[in-house]
Amino acid sequence: KDYNVVLKYIRQEVDMNETFRCAVTDLVTTPVLTVNGWWFDGNPVAEIPEEVVICGLQEASVKYPDLFAKHYNHYAPVAHRDGLVALNTAFAQDGVFVYVPDDVVLERPLQIINLLRAKADLMGFQRNLIVLGKNARATVLVCDHTLSEHDFLINNTTEVYLGPNAHMEYYQVQNQHLRASQINSLFVSEHRNSTFESVAISI
């Protein structure tokens, strides 16, 4: 099957209130959007602690080069051990970057809403990097949705780093139509006394 691959950002008009409606009522989160694997440049300014960074992966590589280089592609397996991750590393241009520094608690869950919308069959690659410092805490809810009826083949990789005594809850909810196929690779590097809890649900 032939798929289109998007290797540059194509801006799409997205009204979060109209395009995406969460089925979970009374859910209070800090929401951010990606569209076809790219950070949505219309994301609202999040109400988060000043020290916390939530932005696109491409933006993080420019604004925070030292932090980015210290963690990016350090926890996923090397290419000869996992061809799908190697494919993601080669083609992924963007995604979500989260940094919670030492002793900081992200009070609201971060909701990453990954939307797929295209006018033709699409293959997408998204790379996410989440870094929690010492004693940091965060909850991340990832919601995957399709907005158009074309075929989608998605290859996503997420790397997570937890410093000493850090705690993270990670939830992934996949709510996509039957013509969407998704490969999610999640790799976690944990330090002493850290805790990582993960739940994945496909609807």
Question: Where are the predicted features?
Answer:
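Short, Gly/Pro- and small/polar-rich lid/capping loops
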Residues: 1-39
